[in-house]
Design a protein with these regions (language model features):
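Conserved phosphate-binding elements of NTP-dependent enzyme cores
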Residues: 1-831
C-alpha cells in the first residue's frame, strides 16, 4: 500500500474528512491556528497508530502502558508503527541531560571504562596495581594495637537470597560474614529478602596490629583477595580501608574501585557524588530539608524549584573523585560533557590513541561521532552534553529527539512532528530540512505540522486544513505540492505562497531617543558585549540558534530591569510574556485568566432569575460549592479506574457534562445558561456579548491575536505554548493604558502561527508600541523581523563562536551587513 487512507475523521473540529497521505514521503500539514492540523496528525493518525501497537501487547503489559482511546474515525488503512516527536514532552528530571537523552553519555561511560587511564584523586599521578606485599605494608602501617577485620567482598549490592553463596562459604570453613553492615554467624539460619539488594563481606580474619602478625596476615590477605576478586577491606573502629590488586596509588595509598561503566554513572551509587547524590547541586534549605520535602508533597511543587548551589564536593560534576580521576587525553568525563557538541566532535576527531586503544574504542567512537554529527545536523552544535533537559526549549528538546531517532536508523516507521523549525534561524533551517529528508530516505513516512514557508515548499505533499479556525475549520481545503496549493484560491496558505496576500514591510521606522545601556555582558557565551536597547519602539533580537539572544534579554536585561527603579524612565513595569502555562490546574481556562469569567458571573447574577433565587456571582463558578454539580465536583466527567485498561472518563450522569447543577442552569442570559456561554468559542461569545463593553473589549483582543477558535471554558492545560503566550499578550493589550508605559519582552511569539495569524500578531504588537510601550522580541520569523523599528543581531555562529554583536540598526541597514546570516535572509525583503 502506497498511502495512508483516512476515512471519516471527526476528532475535535474535523468535519468527517477523508484524505490520503502518501507513504515514505515528507508531508506537511498546514493551516491557521485551530484549523485542525494537530487533530488530524496527532489525535487521529498518530493516536490510532499507537493504539493499534498497544492493542497487540498482552493485557499484562497494557496495564502498565495504558491503552489510548480510539479516535473518532471510521477507518484508517496503511498505518505503520507511529512515533510522535512533539514539543509538549518536557523532562523535569534533574538527572536527565542532553548526553543521557541522546545516549551519547552511555557510550562515553563505556569508552572511559575501556580505555580511560586512572589517576590518583589526591596527587594526580597515574595509578598502578598493588601487589600483595604493597597491601601488606600499608596495613602494617596502622597504629599498634589497632583492631581490624579483614573482609572480602563477595556480593556487591545485588538482589537475591544468596543462599548458595553462604552455603559455599560455610563449607569452605569460614565462620562469619557481614551482611548489609551487620555481623552474622554462618551456622545460624540466614534468610534474606529476595527482592532487596544486599552486600555480603566475608570475614577472613580478625587481627590486632602488633609484632609477629605478618605471616598470618599475608596468608589471610591472599585468601581475602582470592574470595574478593582482587579487592579487600580492612575495617577498623574508625574507618574502612579499601585495597585492590588492580588500581592504587603507591604514594598516597589510595586504591581505586574497578573501572566499570557504572563508575561514571551519576545515577548509580557506585559513581554518584555522595554529597549531592549525583545531582551536581545542593538545595539551599539548610536545616529545613524535611519541612521543605513535606511542603513540596502537599503543595505539589518540585524540590528543584528551591534555591540551589553547586555541590561543594564535586563542584557540579555529579561524580565521585575516583570517576573524575580517570582520563582520556588529559580530560575526564565531566570535562568532555561540559564541552559544546561541536567542540566535543572536534575533540574525538583529533583524538590520538595507541594501536590497542584504537582497536578497543573503534566501535564506541563510531557511535559517539555519529550521534554528535546528528546533533550538529539539526542545529544543536552549541549545546553542551551536560545541559539539563529541563532547561531546553520545546524546539530544542524536539530536535534532540529527532537526532536520536535518526541515530536509531529505523525504517518503515511513521514519524509525526510538531513544528520542528521552532527556534531555528533560517541559516539552521536548511540543516533541519536535510535531516527530515534523510529520515524520509531511510524508508519512513514523515508527517510535519508546520507553518514555516521554507519547510512547506520543501515538502513532497502538503495538506492544507481550514479555511478558518475552530468551527470554521476542520476541512481539507487543498492537497498537493506547493505550486498546486498556491493555485487554490480558497486556501489561505495558497494566498501567501502565491503572493496574493502578504505581510507588507512598514514604509517608515520609528526613531528612538532613549535607550537602556548594557555594558560588558559576559554571561554564558556572551563575550563582554555592550549594546543599547531602544525604548518606545519595537526591537527584535535576532541571530542563529545559540548565539546568545536569550542570555542577553532573559538572563541579563530582564533581571536588571526587575531590580532597577524604572520611574525616572517613566516606565511602570517590565513584563515577560513567555510560553509557560497560564494555569496550573485543569480548572483554569481563558475566561478565568483574563477576568472575563468575573464579568460573566456578575452578568448572570444581575438577571431576574438569579435575583428571584437570591443567587450571587459565586453561584456561577464550578470551582466552589453551591452552583457546581457535586456529583462530579464541577469537572463534568467521572474517572473510572480500569486496571489493565486505560482509565475511562465518563460524562457525569447528573449534570450531563455541564459542570453545574440544574438550579444554576435554570438561570439564563439572552436564552443561554452559564454552561452554554462557557462552551462558546471566543468569536461566538464576541457576538453574543457585543453590547457588554467590559467583556467585548477582552474578547475582541483575543480575536485579534488569532484565538477566536478557543472555547471560553476550555482547560488551560490543553493550550500550546504559543496559545498561552498569546492569551497573556491579549490580556496585557486589553488592560487600560496607565499613566506610565510598560516594557514587554517576548520570546518567539510566532510559535504555532500561520502566515495569516502572524499578520494579526504583528498588528497587535504594533498597537502596544503605538500606545507608548516598549516591545522587545527574540524572533526568527522574517515577517516580524522586517516589521521591527530596530534590530540587534547576535552571532555570527552559535555557542563558543557566537556571543558577539554582529550588527545593530533598522532592517534596511542590517540587510547590507556582509557577515550576518540575518542580513542574507533580509536582503530579498528590504530592498
Amino acid at each position: 500500500m502506497d498511502s495512508i487512507k483516512i476515512r471519516g475523521a471527526r476528532v475535535h473540529n474535523l468535519k468527517n474528512i477523508s484524505v490520503e497521505i502518501p507513504r515514505d514521503k515528507l508531508v506537511v500539514i498546514t493551516g491557521v491556528s485551530g484549523s485542525g492540523k494537530s487533530s488530524l496528525a496527532f489525535d487521529t493518525i498518530y493516536a490510532e497508530g499507537q493504539r493499534r501497537y498497544m492493542e497487540s501487547l498482552s493485557s499484562y503489559a497494557r496495564q502498565f502502558l495504558g491503552l489510548p482511546d480510539k479516535p473518532d474515525v471510521e477507518q484508517i488503512e496503511g498505518l505503520s508503527p507511529a512515533i510522535a516527536i512533539n514539543q509538549k514532552t518536557t523532562n523535569n528530571n534533574p538527572r536527565s541531560t542532553v548526553g543521557t537523552v541522546t545516549e551519547i553519555y552511555d557510550y562515553l561511560r563505556l569508552l572511559f571504562a575501556r580505555i580511560g587511564k586512572p589517576h590518583c584523586p589526591k596527587c594526580g599521578k597515574p595509578v598502578q596495581s598493588q601487589s600483595v606485599d604493597q597491601i601488606l605494608a600499608q596495613i602494617l602501617k596502622l597504629p599498634n594495637d589497632t583492631r581490624f577485620l579483614l573482609l572480602a567482598p563477595v556480593v556487591k549490592n545485588r538482589k537475591g537470597t544468596h543462599k548458595d553463596t553462604l552455603d559455599k562459604l560455610s563449607a569452605a570453613g569460614f565462620v562469619r560474614v557481614k551482611i548489609d553492615g551487620k555481623l552474622r554467624d554462618l551456622d545460624e539460619e540466614i534468610s534474606l529478602a529476595k527482592t532487596k539488594k544486599h552486600s555480603i563481606d566475608l570475614v577472613v580474619d580478625r587481627l590486632i596490629v602488633r609484632d609477629g602478625i605478618r605471616s598470618r596476615l599475608a596468608d589471610s590477605l591472599e585468601t581475602a583477595l582470592k574470595f574478593g576478586d582482587g579487592i579487600v577491606f580492612v575495617e577498623t573502629d574508625e574507618k574502612t580501608l579499601t585495597f585492590s590488586e588492580k588500581n592504587s596509588c603507591v604514594d598516597c595509598g589510595i586504591s581505586l574501585p574497578d573501572i566499570t561503566p557504572q563508575l561514571f554513572s551519576f545515577n548509580s551509587p557506585k559513581g554518584a557524588c555522595p554529597t549531592c547524590n549525583g545531582l551536581g547541586k545542593v538545595f539551599d534549605v539548610r536545616d529545613f530539608t524535611t519541612m521543605y520535602e513535606w511542603m513540596a508533597a502537599v503543595h505539589d511543587f518540585k524540590m528543584t524549584d528551591l534555591p540551589e548551589d553547586a555541590c561543594p564536593a564535586c563542584h557540579g560534576h555529579r561524580l565521585k573523585p575516583e570517576a573524575l580521576s580517570v582520563k582520556i587525553a588529559d580530560k575526564n568525563i565531566a570535562q568532555v560533557v561540559d564541552m559544546s557538541v561541536d567542540a566535543c566532535k572536534n575533540f574525538f576527531a583529533t583524538l590520538e590513541l595507541d594501536a590497542t586503544d584504537k582497536k578497543i574504542a573503534a566501535q564506541i567512537l563510531k557511535e559517539i561521532n555519529s550521534r554528535l554529527k546528528f546533533l550538529c545536523d539539526v542545529g544543536l552544535d552549541y549545546l553542551s552534553l551536560s545541559r539539563k533537559s529541563s532547561t531546553l526549549s520545546g524546539g530544542e528538546s524536539q530536535r534532540i529527539r529527532l537526532a536520536t531517532q535518526i541515530g536509531s536508523a529505523l525504517t518503515g516507521v511513521l514519524y509525526v512532528l510538531d513544528e520542528p523549525s521552532i527556534g531555528l534561524h533560517q541559516h539552521d533551517n536548511q540543516k533541519l530540512l536535510a535531516t527530515l529528508k534523510k529520515l524520509r530516505d531511510l524508508g519512513n513516512t514523515v508527517i510535519v505540522v508546520e507553518h514555516d514557508e521554507e519547510t512547506i515548499r520543501a515538502a513532497d505533499n502538503i495538506v492544507d486544513i481550514g479555511r478558518g479556525a475552530g468551527k470554521s475549520g476542520g476541512e481539507v481545503i487543498a492537497q498537493g505540492t506547493a505550486e498546486e496549493i498556491s493555485r487554490v484560491e480558497n486556501s489561505l496558505t495558497g494566498d501567501y505562497l502565491s503572493g496574493r496576500k502578504k505581510i507588507l514591510v512598514p514604509t517608515t521606522r520609528r526613531e528612538f531617543t532613549r535607550s537602556l545601556p548594557i555594558t560588558d555582558a559576559c554571561k554564558n557565551n556572551l563575550k563582554n558585549i555592550s549594546v543599547k536597547i531602544p525604548l518606545d519602539v519595537l526591537t527584535v533580537v535576532t541571530g542563529v540558534s545559540g548565539s546568545g539572544k536569550s542570555t542577553l534579554i532573559e538572563e541579563i536585561l530582564y533581571p536588571k530591569l526587575r531590580e532597577d527603579d524604572l520611574t525616572p524612565l517613566a516606565i511602570d513595569k517590565v513584563i515577560m510574556i513567555d510560553q509557560d502555562p497560564i494555569g496550573r490546574t485543569p480548572r483554569s481556562n481563558i475566561a478565568t485568566y483574563t477576568g472575563v469569567a468575573d464579568h460573566i458571573r456578575k452578568l448572570f447574577a444581575e438577571t431576574n432569575g438569579a435575583k428571584m433565587r437570591g443567587y450571587k456571582a459565586g453561584r456561577f463558578s464550578f470551582n466552589v460549592r453551591g452552583g457546581r454539580c457535586e456529583s462530579c465536583g464541577g469537572n463534568g466527567v467521572l474517572k473510572i479506574p480500569m486496571n489493565f485498561l486505560p482509565d475511562v472518563y465518563v460524562t457525569c450522569d447528573v449534570c450531563k457534562g455541564t459542570r453545574f447543577n440544574a438550579e444554576t442552569l435554570d438561570v439564563k442570559y439572552k436564552g443561554a445558561n452559564i454552561a452554554d456561554v462557557l462552551s462558546m468559542p471566543v468569536d461566538e461569545a464576541l457576538e453574543f456579548f457585543a453590547n457588554v463593553p467590559t467583556i467585548k473589549r477582552m474578547l475582541q483582543v483575543l480575536h485579534d491575536v488569532g484565538l477566536g477558535y478557543i472555547e471560553l471554558g476550555q482547560s488551560a492545560n490543553t493550550f500550546s505554548g504559543g496559545e498561552a503566550q498569546r492569551v497573556k499578550l491579549a490580556y496585557e493589550l486589553a488592560r487600560p493604558a496607565g499613566r506610565l508605559a510598560n516594557i514587554y519582552i517576548m520570546d518567539e511569539p510566532t510559535t504555532g502561527l500561520h502566515f495569516d495569524d502572524v499578520k494579526k500578531l504583528i498588528d497587535v504588537i504594533q498597537r502596544l508600541v503605538e500606545r507608548g510601550d516598549t516591545v522587545i522580541i527574540i524572533e526568527h520569523n522574517l515577517d516580524v523581523i522586517k516589521s521591527a523599528d530596530y534590530i540587534i543581531d547576535l552571532g555570527p555562529e552559535g555557542g563558543e563562536r557566537g556571543g558577539e554583536i554582529v550588527a545593530c540598526g533598522t532592517p534596511e541597514e542590517i540587510s547590507h551587513v556582509e557577515n550576518s546570516y540575518t542580513a542574507q535572509a533580509l536582503k530579498a525583503l528590504c530592498k
